[in-house]
């Protein structure tokens, strides 16, 4: 039976009926629909609409629906997850099941279910991001004070600790967690009681319903509550930024795994071979992370475009906001799991990376800094060291291999302290500012990252 058949005298066109159904995908919301229905039933009993016996029958029926799931969603007459639950409840509990829809609308139901889903996915995604951060911290600790080149414009820039590079990604993922936490605050409001658009005709205690479902409070406006999908856009956009960060890291790992760089060895459990070339070991896991991040961006855009011109309040277009949310959540979770596994399995060729950090004139900035400490204005120091690099390039040697006479001819007074300042440990130690790559600063950053990670775990425990 349709939920709205009384006003109609003709049946739906069969093709349209099948085409407009959402149950094949919104059955993912079944647990949340059952939970929200249980809270609504409890509120109906509190308002005197249901007796305690009727409430018990409805709750027993809902529990059975939750246990059974929706293994067969092929009945073309069942439109969506809301219709499915109500129909099954009537089958299980009898006529009392028809009372459940008193004072509510599918408009508020889907808004509630989707908020519950987003909240759950935020919590799971946060835990998985934290695991990626934990893997980065583990690897940062494992490489000690080994160095590597940093890059700007994909050209060698200055030496940094490998740990400093890994912690750069940890910082990105920490920001992702704060974005999700911020999104969760706005998502965690309860639309139930808003009904179709103007509010319910039953004297329901909306604050009580919100508490039953773990929401912070009821929504403030029934028109907005039934048409708001800002929380979904924010969620998917937050996931798209996570995807960007995962993609950037994957791209660097792909580059660093090439023979030309040789900085890391791909773990076999996260690589594949070639059907044609026997020697190949391909970074498929990383390439898929990089490629699938595009889908997260596309889903975010799809949501925004779907909603951009909708009048208030609910419109059927909003049915099309669900699948981008589901797809983004599932894809992002998979990408995070794969990335954490890869990070724990990858082998860094620290000797190769450390050697690379000592070549390519990456101590030029340190040399200029040394001259500044001797009282030479930076712009002049920059010019002098630039000339020294030019000479070293012509001589096919490193900056620190130029003789004192070579440097004197350029106007640089070079003694033992100058050459000492160009050695890798001194170059790294020179960056002794908060957030810099000096070993003591990186050690401090590692401790801070671990403390932040512990705090995130404690917050998640409270949320759960």
Curated annotation (Swiss-Prot):
Q: Which Pfam families match?
A: ASL_C2 (PF14698), Lyase_1 (PF00206)
Family designation: Belongs to the lyase 1 family. Argininosuccinate lyase subfamily.
Q: What organism is recorded for this protein?
A: Koribacter versatilis (strain Ellin345)
State the protein's name: Argininosuccinate lyase
Q: Which terms in the GO cellular component ontology are assigned? A: cytosol
* Taxonomic path: Bacteria, Pseudomonadati, Acidobacteriota, Terriglobia, Terriglobales
InterPro entries on file: Arg_succ_lyase_C (IPR029419), Argininosuccinate_lyase (IPR009049), Fumarase/histidase_N (IPR024083), Fumarate_lyase_CS (IPR020557), Fumarate_lyase_fam (IPR000362), Fumarate_lyase_N (IPR022761), L-Aspartase-like (IPR008948)
EC no.?
4.3.2.1
One GO molecular function term of this record is: argininosuccinate lyase activity
């Amino acid at each position: 039976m349709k939920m709205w058949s009384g006003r109609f005298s003709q049946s739906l066109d069969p093709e349209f009926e099948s085409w407009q159904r959402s149950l094949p995908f919104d059955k993912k919301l079944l647990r949340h629909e059952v939970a929200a229905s249980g809270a609504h039933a409890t509120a109906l009993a509190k308002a005197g609409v249901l007796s305690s016996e009727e409430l018990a029958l409805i709750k027993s029926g809902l529990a059975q629906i939750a246990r059974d799931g929706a293994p067969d969603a092929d009945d073309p007459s069942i439109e969506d997850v809301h219709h499915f639950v109500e129909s099954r409840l009537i089958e299980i509990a009898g006529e009392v099941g028809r009372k459940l829809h008193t004072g509510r609308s599918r408009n508020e139901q889907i808004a509630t279910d989707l908020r519950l889903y987003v909240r759950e996915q935020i919590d799971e995604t946060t835990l998985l991001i934290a695991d990626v951060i934990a893997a980065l911290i583990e690897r940062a600790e494992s490489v000690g004070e080994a160095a590597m080149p940093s890059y700007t414009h994909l050209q060698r820039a200055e030496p940094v600790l490998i740990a400093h590079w890994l912690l750069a990604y940890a910082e990105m993922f920490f920001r992702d967690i704060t974005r999700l936490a911020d999104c969760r605050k706005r998502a965690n409001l309860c639309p139930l009681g808003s009904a179709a658009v103007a509010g319910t005709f039953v004297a329901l205690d909306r604050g009580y319903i919100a508490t039953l479902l773990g929401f912070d409070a009821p929504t403030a406006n029934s028109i907005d509550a039934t048409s708001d999908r800002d929380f979904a856009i924010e969620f998917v956009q937050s996931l798209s930024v996570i995807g960007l960060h995962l993609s950037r890291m994957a791209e660097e790992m792909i580059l660093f795994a090439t023979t030309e760089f040789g900085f890391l060895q791909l773990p076999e459990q996260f690589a594949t071979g070639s059907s044609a070339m026997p020697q190949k070991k391909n970074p498929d896991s990383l390439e898929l992370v990089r490629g699938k991040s595009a889908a997260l961006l596309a889903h975010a855009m799809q949501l925004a475009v779907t909603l951009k011109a909708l009048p208030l309040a609910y419109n059927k277009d909003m049915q099309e906001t669900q699948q981008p949310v589901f797809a983004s959540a599932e894809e992002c979770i998979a990408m995070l799991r794969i990335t954490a596994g890869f990070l724990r399995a990858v082998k860094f060729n620290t000797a190769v990376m450390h050697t690379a950090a000592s070549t390519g004139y990456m101590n030029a900035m340190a040399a200029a800094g040394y001259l500044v400490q001797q009282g030479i204005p930076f712009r002049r120091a920059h010019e002098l060291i630039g000339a020294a690099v030019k000479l070293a390039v012509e001589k096919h040697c490193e900056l620190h291999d130029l003789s004192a006479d070579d440097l004197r001819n350029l106007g640089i007074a070079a003694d033992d302290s100058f050459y000492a300042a160009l050695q890798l440990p001194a170059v790294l130690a020179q960056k002794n500012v908060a957030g810099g790559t000096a070993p003591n600063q990186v050690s401090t950053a590692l401790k801070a990252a671990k403390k932040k990670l512990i705090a995130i775990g404690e917050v998640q425990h409270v949320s759960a």
